[in-house]
């Protein structure tokens, strides 16, 4: 359709439903560049209908290549687990909803075939806030079957908000042996938006899955706000550090594994202490305990929160303490109660960077005496997934403590390196 204004300006595009709060004389149009505008129609303006589209017609995901590519010899399997990368805007409500499946993503981004022959399936169609430990198990099972079938790598398309939890969980499930990369990726902006990062991230992920020399669980997302390179972060070391930026994901207390250049077809390793592709077979240790909680210490009723979780039968609790990992004096009594009930209390720090040290102040020493388990420099996401994984294998408190203090998948460092702290002060 066209809106022809009395001043001679013309707006062309597809008529979209308007929001319930829009002015009654406003027309919402999706322009050819993918952006929506609202045009206030008044006297002297004309609306010309040029044609119609069937509801559900795919939007901005348009193949960029005029001629089809010959698929590469490598084989990569894409597992769809929902999230923004497989979503689009619902123009009736203005909200982002799950819409596309993994096969649609693969077919609408033909550049993927430069690096691998693609097969895909949709395992879940959810937004990532609905992810659960039982779904981690399903992803592990499916990825394991794919790798057993001889694929060169696996890509899991996942929502970004809880991706670090899932990446950590998969890292522990595969920590005993992984022959090829398992890559998690997503997008900060839905696939039907012109500013979407879906195609770039998915292409970089397929490149990593098919040709990267490492055989680990990793998250591959934009490394900067442009479209130059993506970063591959070790699954147990990554965290989403910004709500909306393309380069929201960072490695915490650790270096990324690699830079991925999807337009050049190049993988630049940033470290050499990684598990090599093909040097080990597949060994899966799947299973997670769902009754694990993650709570943040705050000035107030933290002891009552811990007590309530114990009363409700939770099997383990991760507490984000302040600074070195401290909690209030009242909460120490709750840690003692948890120990007496055989429930592990793991301590991480709210500061994100740095490590838990309960040997500096008297509060920390009292916490250790009460039974708290320090998580070192683990992220809270990794600590949560690790505790969930351990509790699916044993409930004996001392065994849990010993297993938690073992470095299974590179989730903790023996010493802290100051230069790994990324200053984000803006100056």
Curated annotation (Swiss-Prot):
Cystine bridges: which residues? none
Reactions catalysed according to its record: L-glutamyl-tRNA(Gln) + L-glutamine + ATP + H2O = L-glutaminyl-tRNA(Gln) + L-glutamate + ADP + phosphate + H(+)
Chain ranges passing through the membrane: none
> What start and end residues bound the annotated signal peptide?
none
Keyword terms, alphabetized: ATP-binding, Ligase, Nucleotide-binding, Protein biosynthesis
Protein name, UniProt field: Glutamyl-tRNA(Gln) amidotransferase subunit D
Q: Where is the active site?
A: 84, 160, 161, 240
The subunit structure is: Heterodimer of GatD and GatE.
